[in-house]
Regions:
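Catalytic cores of nucleotide-sugar-dependent glycosyltransferases that transfer UDP/GDP/TDP-activated
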Residues: 2-407
């Protein structure tokens, strides 16, 4: 359409008139596109699925896109997202991204959705919505009033439903394990969710107290959600501790992961510890920085991913394409992959990638990775977070593997 508008305007000789006409045509086209009647024209008559999602990218985005490739063969998938920077709700066709409706008013979208034949609602992630608890009520309203009497499926990519600090890192920067000296409310009063004040307020919105937060989420799980899909047994145990009444609704369905060829590591003398993925505080940046202070001369730490303010004596590879992981592991002569996350990751693609390549792997005894690493013959589960001690535990583990390989 942009080409058509430019072609029409090209015929107008007066520049000022041409600019006004272009602006008028562009505004008219945007209004036509951003119209629910135009939007509904994209429906094919198949069953409709509503996919409620955040707009923050990351592993949740990867999961959504993989699911859309499967679901779009059977459903018209409508994806609802909230963009905090613009304060706009976006409703898009996941199977046809050219159709999009945007509005500041969620009630407009809710009223529209109640009038079409939605068969399923997937609550994939609500992090950074304007008010998460209000959004839970919107989803409940759509379920009650929708023509299709939809089933509601919740996906547990993080722990937002337990605490707005969705990785369960407390005000002291440590994994809380659902407890804090003085209680959750004391932690919550001091907890900073972002260095950016606007982001901090967005992430805290709808959460006056943790007690009220869990009451509203508990009501959603009990009265709105028909199933709760989690990706690992250890994560289910955490959810059940917070909400014992939901146990019968939980289904454990691990992510499907890409299989990689085995990495072929050449003989070498030094020890190379690979930290796989983008490393933030909750992903273990503090652990890596402390290890770097006591790194022996023959031991290297390589972050395959990104890490801000990394110590000078570690290597940061930067962004990478997942399909090239075996070659990258071979380039750095990887001896072991270390997953330093200090929060209970709900799945961890990087853990599966390392196992798929046949590499030794180490992680802390927290969350989904620990369960898989404990069953892996080349896995090391570190029972406490003590970076100085952990570094030499990893080094000793690599040395023992080398001795076994010589036998």
């Amino acid at each position: 359409m942009k080409t058509v508008i430019n072609a029409v305007c090209f015929l107008i000789p007066v520049a000022s008139v041409r600019r006004r006409l272009r602006h008028h045509l562009q505004q008219g086209w945007r209004a036509h596109k951003n119209n629910l009647m135009t939007f509904v024209g994209g429906l094919t008559g198949r069953d409709i699925m509503l996919w409620v999602d955040h707009a923050l990218g990351g592993g949740t985005e990867v999961y959504s896109k993989r699911q859309f490739k499967i679901l779009c063969k059977k459903y018209d998938v409508l994806r609802l997202q909230y963009f905090p920077k613009t304060e706009l709700y976006h409703l898009t066709f996941a199977c046809n991204k050219h159709r999009i409706y945007t509005t500041h008013n969620i009630d407009e979208i809710a009223d529209f959705l109640c009038g079409i034949n939605i068969r399923q609602i997937v609550v994939n992630n609500l992090v950074a919505y304007k008010s998460t608890t209000d959004m839970l009520n919107v989803i409940a309203r759509i379920k009650r009033n929708c023509m299709g009497m939809p089933q509601v499926s919740f996906r547990g990519h993080d722990f937002q439903s337990i605490c707005p600090s969705f990785n369960l890192v407390n005000c002291d920067g440590k994994y809380c394990d659902l407890s804090y000296v003085g209680g959750c409310e004391k932690c919550w009063a001091q907890k900073k969710l972002s260095d950016n004040p606007i982001s901090h307020n967005v992430l805290k919105s709808g959460a006056g107290t943790i007690c009220e937060w869990r009451r509203q989420w508990g009501n959603f799980f009990t009265n709105t959600a028909d199933e709760i899909i989690l990706f690992a047994e250890p994560i289910a145990k955490i959810f059940i501790r917070a909400y014992p009444e939901i146990e019968q609704k939980i289904k454990i369905i691990p992510h499907t992961v890409q299989n990689y060829r085995a990495a072929k590591i050449k003989p070498h003398d030094d020890i190379n510890i690979i930290v796989l993925g983008n490393i933030s505080h909750q992903k273990g940046a503090g652990v890596i920085c402390q290890m770097a202070q006591h790194l022996p001369d023959n031991v290297n730490i390589i972050v395959v991913g990104e890490m801000k303010n990394a110590p000078d004596n570690i290597t940061v590879h930067g962004k990478y394409k997942a399909k090239k992981l075996p070659q990258i592991m071979e380039k750095y002569n990887a001896d072991i992959v270390f997953i330093p996350s200090i929060w209970p990751e709900t799945f961890s693609y990087t853990t599966s990638e390392a196992i798929s390549m046949g590499l030794p792997i180490a992680c802390f005894d927290i969350g989904a990775p620990a369960g898989r690493v404990a069953k892996y013959k080349r896995g090391l589960v570190l029972t406490e977070i003590n970076p100085d001690k952990n570094l030499f535990q990893i080094i000793d583990f690599v040395k023992n593997l080398r001795q076994e390989n010589k036998k």
